[in-house]
Each structure stands twice: as structure tokens, then as C-alpha cells.
């Protein structure tokens, strides 16, 4: 009987260890994929940014709001996922495909899609984790409003090449800033 109990305990420990080893290594994978996506996004530049200064606009990226909210891991992952999804939606639109080099656009969108898969895997592992809904909802709403402002801007500018260049630079800034949420993920993992 003692051997059976020891064997069962060992199985439980091993299965728990294997589940944890399959766990969410998001800071590392997200950072690598994000760097690759940013590199491709930089390569997508078609116009000198200085030639589009008259089209510049402050879209009010909600990073300040996100930073001030002391977002925990359970909240950071949905915010990163929404930021990535909204970026993917923007760059997979019909108007976007006309504005960019198809090879670079496909590469960028593939990187975003891989990031979404990583984020979704981590979200699935958080099932049952209680998260403060108000803070998370505020951050998600801020991200959605930010992308709505970008979409309205593109529509008002009739998806001009300069408008897309301004948006490309803005999205580059947003994705670059998103890595600021990663230390929170690393801290909670330890």
C-alpha cells in the first residue's frame, strides 16, 4: 500500500512538473517575436517620416494608463493580446494590403499571429484565475479606443500613403512600449 501511495504521489508530482514546464514562458517568447515584428515593421517604411510631418497626430497611446494601473500577469496578458489583435486587424484590412509591400506585410502579420497564439496559450493556462475586472476592463477599453482613433484617422485621410506611414510609426511605438508590461510577467513567474 505504501508503494502504491508513493507511486501515485510521484505521478502527481511528475504530471504537475510537466504541465508547468509546458507553461507560459511569455516574457521570453513575446520579446523575441515582438523584436522580429518590430524589425519587419521598420522595413515596411515607404516614405521618409519627415515628408509626412503635416499628417502627424497624437493618438493617445494608453501606455501611461496601463503603467499606472499596476497591472498583474492575469491582466497584462489580455491587454497584450488585445493590443496584438487590434494591430493584426489593422494590418490585415483591405486598405492596408494596398499600402504595403506584400511580402513584408505577410511576414509582419505572421509574427503577430504567432504572438497571438502564445498569448492565447497563456490565457488558457489562467483559467480560473481571479483578476480584478475593473482595472483590466479599463485597460482593454483604452486599447480599443486607441485603435478606433487610428481607424478614424485613416478613414479621414482616405488611407493616404502619409497616413499609413504615420500609423506605421505609431504602431511601432505602441508595440515597442508593450514590452514594458513584460517585467510584471517575469516578476510574477518567480
From Swiss-Prot:
Alphabetical UniProt keywords: Antiviral defense, Cytokine, Disulfide bond, Glycoprotein, Secreted, Signal
Any one GO biological process: defense response to virus
Pfam families to which the protein is assigned, alphabetical: Interferon
Cited SUPFAM superfamilies: 4-helical cytokines (SSF47266)
Record carries keyword Secreted: yes
Disulfide bonds: 24-122, 52-162
Keyword Glycoprotein: yes
Signal peptide segment: 1-23
Function statement: Produced by macrophages, IFN-alpha have antiviral activities.
Record-given protein name: Interferon alpha-2
Gene source species: Mus musculus (Mouse)
Amino acid at each position: 500500500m505504501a508503494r502504491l501511495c508513493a507511486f501515485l504521489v510521484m505521478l502527481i508530482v511528475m504530471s504537475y512538473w510537466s504541465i508547468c514546464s509546458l507553461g507560459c514562458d511569455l516574457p521570453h517568447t513575446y520579446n523575441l517575436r515582438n523584436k522580429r515584428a518590430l524589425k519587419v515593421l521598420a522595413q515596411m517604411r515607404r516614405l521618409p517620416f519627415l515628408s509626412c510631418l503635416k499628417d502627424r497626430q497624437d493618438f493617445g497611446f494608453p501606455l501611461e494608463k496601463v503603467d499606472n494601473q499596476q497591472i498583474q500577469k492575469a491582466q497584462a496578458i489580455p491587454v497584450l493580446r488585445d493590443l496584438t489583435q487590434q494591430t493584426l486587424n489593422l494590418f490585415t484590412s483591405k486598405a492596408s494590403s494596398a499600402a504595403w509591400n506584400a511580402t513584408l506585410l505577410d511576414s509582419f502579420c505572421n509574427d503577430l499571429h504567432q504572438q497571438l497564439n502564445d498569448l492565447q496559450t497563456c490565457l488558457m493556462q489562467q483559467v480560473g484565475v481571479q483578476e480584478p475586472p475593473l482595472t483590466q476592463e479599463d485597460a482593454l477599453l483604452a486599447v480599443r479606443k486607441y485603435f478606433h482613433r487610428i481607424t478614424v484617422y485613416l478613414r479621414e485621410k482616405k488611407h493616404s500613403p502619409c497616413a499609413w506611414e504615420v500609423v506605421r510609426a505609431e504602431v511601432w511605438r505602441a508595440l515597442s512600449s508593450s514590452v514594458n508590461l513584460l517585467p510584471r510577467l517575469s516578476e510574477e513567474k518567480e
